[in-house]
């Protein structure tokens, strides 16, 4: 493994126990990257778990609502930080946005997630989020 990967991304992949419709909670309703979503959204995707997540160095934007999935599955690895699905962080002088969403093609056609991605790209280059 490339040791700097965790520093860059903020964690490691740790299985994908759910492939279903889930509820995603917005981590910070004041953050312009995701505020337009409201408190939660429902999507259908394959949900990846993250291990060794750097909670202190990351700002979680989206997280899985655990009430929307079966937590008794053998591949589920509960962590004290829950199931973050999108976050921002810094790496050196750079800005990093990561999302564990996007396995299913339909996610890329979802206007809400397209807007999150545009906002994240704008944030990464130091520009404000879309204002609509």
Task: Show where each model-derived region lies.
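A basic- and aromatic-enriched beta-loop-alpha substructure that forms the phosphate/nucleotide-
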Residues: 1-14
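Exposed alpha-helical structural elements
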Residues: 1-4, 32, 112
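Catalytic beta-strand/loop cores that center a nucleophilic Ser/Cys/Thr
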Residues: 11-92
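Extracellular ligand-binding/catalytic regions of CAZymes and related secreted enzymes
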Residues: 68-132
């Amino acid at each position: 493994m490339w040791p700097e990967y965790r520093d860059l991304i903020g964690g490691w992949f740790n299985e994908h126990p759910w492939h279903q419709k889930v509820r995603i909670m917005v981590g910070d309703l004041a953050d312009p990257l995701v505020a337009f979503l409201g408190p939660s959204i429902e999507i259908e995707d394959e949900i990846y778990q993250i291990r060794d997540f750097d909670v202190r160095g990351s700002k979680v934007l989206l997280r899985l609502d655990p009430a929307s999935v079966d937590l008794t599955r053998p591949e589920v690895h509960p962590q004290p930080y829950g199931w973050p699905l999108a976050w921002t962080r810094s790496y050196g002088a750079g800005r990093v946005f990561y999302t564990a969403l996007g396995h299913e093609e339909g996610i890329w056609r979802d206007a809400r997630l397209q807007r999150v991605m545009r906002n994240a790209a704008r944030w990464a280059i130091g520009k404000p989020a879309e204002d609509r």
